[in-house]
Design a protein with these regions (language model features):
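Short, intrinsically disordered or compositionally biased N-terminal tails of bacterial proteins
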Residues: 1-12
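Mid-protein regulatory/catalytic core that forms ligand/cofactor-binding pockets
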Residues: 4-5, 116-228
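Basic amphipathic alpha-helical segments that dock to polyanions
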Residues: 22, 41, 52-62, 185, ...
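Short acidic, hydrophobic short linear motifs in intrinsically disordered regions
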Residues: 32-42
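Key DNA-contact positions within bacterial/archaeal DNA-binding proteins
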Residues: 50, 106
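A short, conserved structural fragment
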Residues: 60-70
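Basic, amphipathic "hinge/linker" alpha-helix immediately C-terminal to the N-terminal HTH DNA-binding motif
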Residues: 71-90
């Protein structure tokens, strides 16, 4: 099976807590090695520049972040603690939805975006116990406070001319946010732990699923910008 995917804008209109959404986005940008800027929030969430600037200014007044001289957004201790809490609840919700409820892998991210804002600390603690303190979410991303393995983006791998079989370690938020793309990944077995081959073709990256013999069983192509959020290792 061969799939070509074109990037589309994220649909975040139904998320219910803008402050928490921005805090989580900043933390995710840091996690992906991307400098947190207002422009990056515009890219991630699809909000207008003026809306993002107004929200960031309010968050700075509330003591959740600082806008540095180089325009970088730096979370305060209070902001980081709250961002970590929201991200942890989000990833616990994803594990619950997949492992216990049995929701489709491609759908759990969108649903967890709603749960993260309404989950109480009591429920969070019970989920940690119920799920046996999971170390990663369904897309290979570590629970906040837990270190992850050494991995780099598929974009970096192809730009550095890395060849041979690679392993998907984790899938970043911009890919998770599109259920259609995730479904295409899932159909080809492209989950964390899957063996893949990568190749650049202009401004897109071909991600080839490899079978046990190392042969290509199918592939999809994604924009280079999205490949930056597919993290792989040589293991």
């Amino acid at each position: 099976m061969f799939i070509t995917y074109l990037m589309k804008e994220a649909d975040v209109a139904d998320l219910i807590d803008t402050t928490e959404m921005y805090l989580k986005t900043i933390l995710e940008l840091e996690e992906d090695g991307v400098t947190p800027l207002r422009a990056r929030i515009v890219d991630r969430l699809g909000h207008s520049g003026p809306t993002v600037s107004q929200t960031v200014a309010r968050m700075e007044r509330d003591g959740l972040l600082h806008v540095m001289g180089d325009r970088r957004l730096e979370l305060t201790d209070t902001g980081r603690a709250r961002a970590t809490e929201v991200l942890r609840k989000h990833r616990l919700a994803e594990r619950l939805l997949l492992d216990v409820i049995g929701m489709d892998w491609a759908q759990v991210h969108d649903e967890a975006c709603r749960w993260e804002h309404v989950m109480s600390d009591t429920v969070e603690a019970r989920l940690i116990e119920l799920l046996k303190d999971p170390s990663v979410d369904p897309y290979g991303n570590p629970m906040p406070g837990m270190g992850g393995g050494v991995a780099h983006s598929a974009e970096l791998a192809v730009r550095s001319l890395e060849v041979g079989a690679l392993t998907i370690e984790r899938i970043g938020e911009p890919i998770q946010a599109d259920a259609e793309l995730l479904a295409a990944f899932d159909e080809l077995g492209l989950r964390p732990g899957a063996r893949v081959g990568l190749s650049a073709h202009g401004n897109v990256v071909r991600v080839a699923a490899l079978d046990e013999a190392g042969d290509v069983s199918g592939y999809l192509t994604i924009p280079m910008a999205l490949a930056a959020h597919l993290f792989v290792s040589g293991q």
